[in-house]
Amino acid sequence: MALTLADVDKIARLSRLQLTAEEKEKSLQELNDIFTMVEQMQNINTDGIEPMAHPHEVALRLREDEVTETDRAAEYQAVAPEVRNRLYIVPQVIEE
């Protein structure tokens, strides 16, 4: 699958990006390189290969949960401008 400049134009428009002609050409090349790599990966025969969560054998060193610090929330919240139900109240910065 190869993209065209029209595809890049559409992606840029949907993403609300304004790209120069040079940026469009560069994006086209980079996207086509990605698709080429994906196609190569899809053509690899993986029959008989077990799925794995991690490529390396990992043994986690587990330990008991122990409290190592005291609860200092009251101390921290004492200097906050506004706290309600142990939550910091901050000005709204994102419109609904």
Swiss-Prot record:
GO terms for biological process: glutaminyl-tRNAGln biosynthesis via transamidation; regulation of translational fidelity; translation. Disulfide bonds: none annotated. Belongs to the GatC family. This is Aspartyl/glutamyl-tRNA(Asn/Gln) amidotransferase subunit C. Heterotrimer of A, B and C subunits. HAMAP family: GatC (MF_00122). Allows the formation of correctly charged Asn-tRNA(Asn) or Gln-tRNA(Gln) through the transamidation of misacylated Asp-tRNA(Asn) or Glu-tRNA(Gln) in organisms which lack either or both of asparaginyl-tRNA or glutaminyl-tRNA synthetases. The reaction takes place in the presence of glutamine and ATP through an activated phospho-Asp-tRNA(Asn) or phospho-Glu-tRNA(Gln). It catalyses: L-glutamyl-tRNA(Gln) + L-glutamine + ATP + H2O = L-glutaminyl-tRNA(Gln) + L-glutamate + ADP + phosphate + H(+); L-aspartyl-tRNA(Asn) + L-glutamine + ATP + H2O = L-asparaginyl-tRNA(Asn) + L-glutamate + ADP + phosphate + 2 H(+). Pfam families: GatC. InterPro entries: Asp/Glu-ADT_sf_sub_c, GatC. Signal peptide: none annotated. One of its GO terms (molecular function) is asparaginyl-tRNA synthase (glutamine-hydrolyzing) activity. Its EC number is 6.3.5.-. Keywords: ATP-binding, Ligase, Nucleotide-binding, Protein biosynthesis.
